[in-house]
Amino acid sequence: MSTARPRIITSKAPLLPQQTTPEQRYWRQYTSAQLVKEHNSVTHISFNPQHPHDFAVTSSTRVQIFSSRTRQVIKTFSRFKDVVYSASFRSDGKLLCAGDATGLVSVYDSYNPRTILLSINASTHPTHVTKFHTQDNKILATASDDRVTRLWDISNAYEPQLELTGATDYVRTLSFIPAAPHLVATGSYDGLIRLYDTRSSGSTPIYSLNHDQPVENVIAVSPTQIVSCGGNNFKVWDLTSNKKLYERGNFNKAVTCLDYVENFDSPMQSALIASSLDGHVKVFDPLDNFQVKFGWKFSGPVLSCAVSPSTAQGNRHLVAGLSSGLLAIRTKKKEKRSSDKENAPASFNKNAKSNNFQRMMRGSEYQGDQEHIIHNDKVRSQRRMRAFERNINQFKWSEALDNAFVPGMAKELTLTVLQELRKRGKVRVALYGRDESTLEPLLNWCLKGIEDVRSASIVADWVAVVLELYGNTLESSPVLQELMIDLKTKVRHEIHKSKEAQRIEGMLQLLTS
């Protein structure tokens, strides 16, 4: 019984193993993007610590609350007389505080923008930092351009409880140390991170850490470690030894914002998010020496970034604010949980019916579609043969070689033709009776293919036969002679690179052995 002639198998390069890491696959799930245009630069983003984790966006003279479910504005706080800064939630999510360029600090109900619960004249200078204490809900911290950080009791806010001085430039950030409610870390444009003990009556810092660049943000990642950013890097400090642990300079421009989150459904137990003026937002793993794991590129300088807190809902949103006024909201796609629906009790299933009803209605929707089974015995039309395949099947070796270099032919197909002719021992036959115009395409392809190690052996075999058959023709043709000179130069260059690679390999073996 006759069989169909087998097709020529296209030559394919070996596939590399999958290089994506579990961390990359997790952060790539933030695919659903929404862009919101604000009137001015988005300077601060804060998530509500309590469910459903709505987030406040500070821009120009207003603060907007976005719903974490719909990603739409649900509340707008616009009763500010000047540019507003750093709106943030209290730990219980019930209050929202913000400072403005006049120095006034306002405290609102988180979802009632009409009434101001408290107004504090913190300073006559712009108040850039306002933040509630993470454990004591009555304590509010503010930092203004008068280089003074103040702690207020909102139940009696006529005067500050404590004033923290010592900064010689603007204070732009502060952070409370977890598990140590009496410690406050501040960062200023004089390049120093100062640590204060609020239990002492004095207002001078316990000690200072030198960041060497104007400090934009300070955040605590553990009871003994804080991270500061400024310039094109961020630094990790150990509070027990007062020394720098790590320094990461993965950015080309100044790092503007830091955010620390814990992940319950991620390969990373925790993550440090950093944004920069170069338009990048990158993810670092604190448990892996703060190595970068993933990143996003935005259209402009990023001034603020935040990730929703990790609870039963998971880290659902990544929000970045740009200097152009663009707010980018990236949402992680939801996982399909079919097993939950299958395991749910019947009492919670609205469409569930009793067994008697199901037996009564059995077969009512059958339409006889399984009584007649039609077998399609038509022979599938095979893929159309290419020109070089037809010529090879018809033993037209020279024409098959010409078809390999037609314009638009893929490199893999050209390599397939050359390998097939070499496998069949028809290299000399395919090269007989050629002149300058028919040899030039082959030599041009060899000149490009010699750089690829996967096709170097094919190029060497074909060029050797060309030199053997057409040595005199190459000397008399200026075009072919120039191609051969270029090919010789490139071969020498590749040999030089191979020798250098072997030298480097030997050096690395000495270092690793």
From Swiss-Prot:
Alphabetical UniProt keywords: Nucleus, Repeat, Ribonucleoprotein, Ribosome biogenesis, rRNA processing, Transcription, WD repeat
Alphabetized InterPro entries for the sequence: U3_snoRNA-assocProt_15_C, WD40/YVTN_repeat-like_dom_sf, WD40_repeat_CS, WD40_repeat_dom_sf, WD40_rpt
One of the GO BP terms on file: rRNA processing
GO cellular component, one term: 90S preribosome
Segments for region (Disordered): 332-354
Organism domain of life: Eukaryota
Ranges occupied by WD repeats: 37-78, 79-118, 124-162, 166-206, 210-247, 250-294
One Gene Ontology molecular-function label: U3 snoRNA binding
Compartment list: Nucleus, Nucleolus
Subunit-structure text: Interacts with snoRNA U3. Interacts with MPP10. Component of the ribosomal small subunit (SSU) processome composed of at least 40 protein subunits and snoRNA U3. In the absence of snoRNA3, forms a complex with other t-UTPs. This complex can associate with pre-18S ribosomal RNAs.
Function, as annotated: Involved in nucleolar processing of pre-18S ribosomal RNA. Required for optimal pre-ribosomal RNA transcription by RNA polymerase I together with a subset of U3 proteins required for transcription (t-UTPs).
Note: Present with 358 molecules/cell in log phase SD medium.
Family matches, as PANTHER family: U3 SMALL NUCLEOLAR RNA-ASSOCIATED PROTEIN 15 HOMOLOG, UTP15 U3 SMALL NUCLEOLAR RNA-ASSOCIATED PROTEIN 15 FAMILY MEMBER
UniProt-recorded name of the protein: U3 small nucleolar RNA-associated protein 15
